[in-house]
Amino acid sequence: MYQETKRYIERKLKKIEYIYTKLPDGYEDIEIRYRKVRDEIGILQNVVNGLTYYEYGGTVMKNVAHWANIVGESTNINAIKREDIYTNTSTVGMQLAHTVSDKSLKEVCTEFSTAYENIAIEKRKMNEKMEDVTDELNNLKKKCKQIDHQRHIVKNIRYDLEELLQSNVYKEDIKNRLEKKLESNGKEIQEQMTDFVHLSMINGIIVKIAKIHKEFCEAAGNHLEKFN
């Protein structure tokens, strides 16, 4: 690992033009495609995290908590905890139900509280499903690390071989060994990148994210149906 890191730094500091060495046909094209798919994984992880945890932060969340605490103080009800926005919204409805005397308004506040309590439950169910998606993305990320490690090895081999050939001073057996390593390692990692691009299941994961979120939105809408 130390030698690979050292060679990586050397390649960055002392760049050379590749004249005598070639990668397997199609290697660079599949590498570009692989890197695009790899980078999409990180973007999808951010999307999943955003959809999973949005209810725990932000200005809206702080305002709801602040409002609920004020209502609680005015009615001698214990101030709410900093939970998710749906649970806090439910608490707001419950606390308002305790502050009003009008029976009809009290009923609306109670129904409001119940609806958002149920939405909070649905959101927790959605979050659990999103955890499975996160696991899938993490597994793909681990595979990417393995592929990237092998890609760096190929780059180091090519660099060493090109440097050797440009020096015009080398032993034939060393040249032959590096050429064989470049060819074999290059083809192997090319196959891995090709398989990853075709089997990464990115499209399936995107569909799964949308489906999970859709199920939550529909369930939340059903709980709010009575307020039409």
From Swiss-Prot:
Entry superkingdom: Eukaryota
Principal cellular location given in the protein's record: other
Key words, A-Z: Coiled coil, Glycoprotein, Sporulation
Gene Ontology CC entries for this record: spore wall
Kinase as UniProt keyword: no
Glycosylated position list: N88
GO BP term, pick one: sporulation resulting in formation of a cellular spore
Sections of the chain in a coiled coil: 115-195
Keyword Coiled coil: yes
Compartments reported by the entry: Spore wall
Membership in a protein family: Belongs to the SWP12 family.
Protein name: Spore wall protein 12
Gene coding for it: SWP12
